[in-house]
Curated annotation (Swiss-Prot):
Virions are comprised of 60 copies of the coat protein. It holds the Pfam family Nepo_coat_C. Specific enzymatic cleavages in vivo by the P1 encoded 3C-like protease yield mature proteins. It comes from the Viruses. This is RNA2 polyprotein. Belongs to the nepoviruses RNA2 polyprotein family. The lineage of its organism: Viruses, Riboviria, Orthornavirae, Pisuviricota, Pisoniviricetes.
Amino acid sequence: MSESGNTTSMPGCGRMCALRSTWSKRAFLVACKDGALTSDGRCPQYGCGALVSITKGVQQPKKTASAKVVKCLCWVQPARWCEKHSKGPASPNGSVTTKRSNSARAAPAPLPYKKQTCDVVVTVGPLELVYPALVSEELPTPVAATPTKVEEVPIPELPLWLAPAWMVEQPYAATPEVLCLTQREEFALLKKRLTRKGKLLQRRATHARFEARAALARVRAATQRKVEEVTALVIKGRRILAAHQLLRELEEVAPLSQAQEQLVASSCAAAAARQEECASFLRRAKAWRKSISATPPVAFATAVASKVVSATMPWAHLGLSLGGLLAVPTLDGTLGAKQWNAKTIATWVLKPVVSCVQSVHAKVRDWLHSQPEVGVTNTKVPLVLPEVCLGVLSPPSLSEEIVDNPQETSQSGIWHPEMGVRNIYVFHDDSWETSPEEDENYTYTFSRQCGIPYLLVEGRGAEERKNTILGWDFSLHNDGEFEFLPSPEEGYTKELVTPVALEEEDKYSTASSCGFFSLDDVSSAITIQCPGLLSADADVHFFDGPGYRCSSRPRDFRPPVVRGCDYESRVKASIQRKIENPLQERFITVLREKRKKNKKKEFHSFSACFAFKRKQIQWPPTPNEMVNEWEEYCIAQAWLPFEVVVTDEIEDVTPLYPGGRDYNCNSQLLFPLAPLSTVYCDDSCFHPNDGWTTDGNGKHFRLSPQFVLPDVPIPIVHRVTRQLPQFLYDLGIGDLTCNSGYQAENLQEEIQERMEDRSEEKPVPSLDTLISKLSKRSTKVKGAGENRYADRHSLTEKAIFHQPGALSRMRSGKEKTIVAANHNSDQISVRMAECGKPVFTPLPRMSDEMLRKFLEKGLGSTSTVALDIGIQSHIPQGMPTVAFVNVMDTRIEDPLYSSLCGSYIDLGRDRAKTLCLPLVNFPMSKLAEDVDDVLNGLMLCTHFQDSTKFGVGKPAFQYGTLEFQEFKPSAYSDFSRVRDNWDAIAKQQNTPNDRILAGFSVLGAVSQAYNQALPVFKSVELVAPPKRKPVVATFQNPTTLGRSNTTRSFRMPTMDLPRSTGRDAPIPIVHRRNNNDVHGFDEATPARFSTCDSGLVADTTLAFAKMYQCKKDAKAGHVLATIDIQECVFEDNRRVALDWLAHGLASFKYDLQLTVDSNPFVGVTLGITVDAFDRLLPQISDEVIAVPLAFQLPTYLFPISKKGTFTQTIDFAAIAGYNFFPHVAAFGRPKIIVYIVSDNDLPASDTWMCLVELHMTRLESSTLACSPTLVLPQAFGGDLPLDLWRGPYTFPLGGGTKRLSTSLDIGTSTTTVSGWRTVSFPAAYALFLQGHGGSLVGEVVHTGSAAVSCALHLCISFGGAPPTLEEALVFPGFRLPSGEGKFHIKVQTPYGRLSTLTPDCALYVYLAGGPIAVAPMSVPYQFCIHLERLVDDGAPPRTIGLIREFNWATINNFKSDDITFAIPARLSDLVLTCGDVTMSTNPLALLIGSCGFFRGNLTVVLEWATFLKAGDKEGTVQLTTCRGMINNVKGVRNAIQKKVVNLSLVGSVSRYLNVGDFTGFAQSGGQVGYDEIFLEFSTNKAKQIRYLNINVELDENFELYGRTIIPLKNTAPAFASTSASAPNES
């Protein structure tokens, strides 16, 4: 402000700038309002923006002499800015800067002020500024004043500790300098403090959460430790109980029969005598040797040996021929191996045995030749062929006589008895001076080298049988464990490889001595395997003996050297064989480990599954538990009882010694009571020659599992990451799943369901202690079945989706796949509904806001991968209530495919949960219909089955859903995070190929299959796409407007618009997004034969039109027209005929239109019957057909009393099951028969006409067959389709008849008035059901005159006297007030269902009112009943549909012995002259006769019974599979397969056949003139056959096509028949 107070302006942007003018305050406001200045007082010119300064004049103070100049203005500004009192000027932010010069800063203008006479305190923020008074107001000192006397009062002194706080002098504390902050700085400090406070609160909350989690983890760990302790106790208890149970079962004794006891007693006596004889012979031999020790040597004579005819061993009757080991031609060098079963013993077992035997013979011969005093017969050991070793030769029959006299061998005049397989070689040698104990060293025994197969029966005998091998293993002096390989070929050089080198290489695997042996170089294998036997020294070793006393010869531990060969290929082949049989490899590995521990070789370890041979052992029983193997091995000898070894059919075997003593023998497996890992038997109880031992329980044989291994099948168990038990007695207890059932009856089952199996840690003291500990534990256990805590977090995204890796994160941002787990619903209630009625509730997939966000991100589709549904039942626990919850796709109209996956939920278990995989994708767009699909595309359908009568409409349960979704940006996105392996999702569930993966309280599941068969893609007609724009009109010479003189208005000239403006051409739209052009509101096909678009559209679908006439007094059954479908189309050669010729084999659909003038009084009803296989034409005589016979086929009724034009759509593909070819018939000529159903109530005045039109609405090229009508074995779906008509029935005027009935024996034949019996396809189909319950659905059609009317009441009654109308009104029924209409009646019987073969249950029709007619009328009320179907009410019907084998025919009373006849493979009737044929009448036979054609596979089984006696071997039967014509005169045929059996020994023969000719299908009558497959039966003793039954066994998916009838003569009724033309009247 200036001193003068005038308004000045700062220089502006130029001379015209507004800032150069003078502004007053008012003028300034006006300028801002008018826009001359901006609102903030700046120049509005571009590039200027100068600010206007307005100064205001103030009143100057008057100048007085006493006015003083202000010396300092420090009080006006902060002290730090003062130039006088501060060291230097400071900036507002507090930083000291350099001192400013006075010139740089203008002096502030002095302000007027008053004299300050007091101190002024100014508070600025936290500061208090005190300004002292500028003018003193002290009073002047009085001049003559007398000083007053002042009395000083002494102040009492207080100690410091008694003084108050305000009296205590406080030291002065230097207060730091307080800075004056601006508002921005204060706000910044405040924000900083708030931020620090918020972070502090967050850290505290985080620490609190961490501490809570740590505490929870500690609690869980403690709980888990307790659970594991209890689990260990439970497992120990289970094992103890299982072991005790197993021992109790093993201790059970199976009683022996008398014949078995006699055989055991006689065998024991024979063995004792044999042992005594052996001991006597040894004593004589030793005595003789001592007597001749001093005599000179005597030369040997020629050795004479005789074959042992029958050994004295207890197994002699089994057909084994055991001989000695002398080198004579009569020697059985195989030791009975030629009688073995080749299917049981492997080749590699027999080859070394035979080679060892031959080598021993050679060694004995060489040793005898080395003795000069010993003479040896010059004989050669016969070579044993492999065919003999493998048991190709048939075993001999059972010995009738048992020879107990041992044969003797003469050598040097001394006879030596030959006892069993033991041969003692005595040599005449002076140097032989040994002790009697050394006799056994020169005894070669092979009793432990031959494995003998037997049928063993476990001690529990009645439970099951097991196949194993009783035998003895090798005991060779060899410590090396490797595989023997043959010599290399000539010219092949390679580095020598030793077994030690093989073991050092990782790619090779060594085998034990019981591994595979080479078949090409047996001698080299024996050389390495038996080095002691083939050595040149005289120290002969033995193979068997007590204690394995082989200390006479030191063992050679040097690794044997094998000649070089192609080890790489040989060893790899050996490894491959072991991989193919891992069970054998595992046994070899265990055996190798046991041998390293210097265990006895005969004490081989064997797995428990070998001893029991059981695929499934469960204790306690659990669902879906199967034991695959046990890795705990028994280190003990197992002994088998003698009577088990012999045979299980012991009653048919002659005892060795009749009348022998009774010997009580135990028939059980002997297991030691001590732990199996520490107890094993000694050799002292085993006799090396006999191979058996005696104890208090009987005689037992030692068991070796060595030969069992190669042939034991390995059971395959389908498990998903399943950990099986690793101990022996844990029989079938594995990890629990949420599918485990809840059974509270047994505490052990509850323990098993709640606890997981773990390894044994601590023993359990007693079962009472275990129960008491379990009663104190928590009720919520991880993984439990009933009390499982199923919250929304039980399944995580990691279990469903892959986590993206580093490479996935580096992908382009455009290709991103999002996954989410949305908890969409939580408390959706489902209310109880009636049985059979569905309840639809939503399954929301996401919210509208979530969908909007996904659309903004550019996502294009969403997939529902997994759906976790948790259910909280409101039904009281334990109640029998089941709900079927089904996830359905609302976009699919067919309920069969709309149902994705469903589960049967037990609502009496409080909680339930199911995890399913819908695997459905929805598009995401902004269209309204697509948005609805995304949000509500899935729906939950619930059906209830309640026996408690829970209130309908009451909430039954609540459910919540957790949905795992995957979102993709586009259809081109190949990146998916869904796990490909569903096992990772299923985890411990055993359903890798099912959409229902988990669940508890779930009784069962139903889901769509992943791999469903694809349908046949039918032919389509390709058309060009529609135009996107309408027709564009162009103007060549446009009209121009001339300029008018006036501009006020002008007139448009007349315009002659052309007619072809294109307005008639519609704008093309896409109707339903799939169809062709749409003209107007109707679809139209462009004209094919027209040259101009005239707008006239002809009816191109008309295929046939013809006028027929009817007599005025036509009766029921009169045939008006018989239309041949394949010929009528070509009568006029319309467009339909040409299209059919172009398509060839085609599928079509007709609209049949009948035009008759409507007349309500005549009372004529027309019937139309479709005969697709030409079965009714032979039954039409004199243009009359039996109406009940026509009612068995698809029929439609048209009463002319209602209207004059009738239209009915007929789908021939659905009725006939096949498609048609023009002119030529395939399986039949389809016909449409039009006839009169009921008589005229009133005769017409004259003949009347009827127009029949056929419009072909569909014509498509197709294959021969359509969908099958029925597939066997048939899985009944619940509804039984009938489509049968009954009637016509009449109620006469006057109320004479008040009740009519028709029986519901649907499966019976129908007897017509012409004496024919007919069986329809629905009746034959009903024969597969013994009974059916539910409701009957049908319709009553009025067929008479409209002048007569009445009211009807319908009900169903079972057995007893027919109910009256008053009683029927109490039953569940249906009222028809107009006398016609549809009805739905519940079937009530004492058994819950009705029989399809007996007339006990009937449908009763009562006259509820009427009939009423006008006075001249005297006709009755006529009607027909249409039985549509039987609807199941939930109870499963009694069915025989699972039976596959049916009898087709029986032949007896053959005329001659040599007969030959053919059996067609098309299930036709047999007409034979060689015997009497009786064709069976069963459901299969009636279905074959009542269907059009069929195909599939079957097995023809021929069984016969003869007049021959047992043992007669007469006659043969030959069954030949042929191809050709059965009735061919020349007999030209091709024999494909032949089979010949004995007539008396074999009672049946079968052959697998494919039903069908060159078309792939077959008819019972066959195709005339074409080859077919048939069986030819021939025999030369036909008169000896009493009965010959021909049975057929259907294979899976045997298909039947088409529907027709079987017209049979009424000779022998097949079932209880009813008359359809004469109903029961009362």
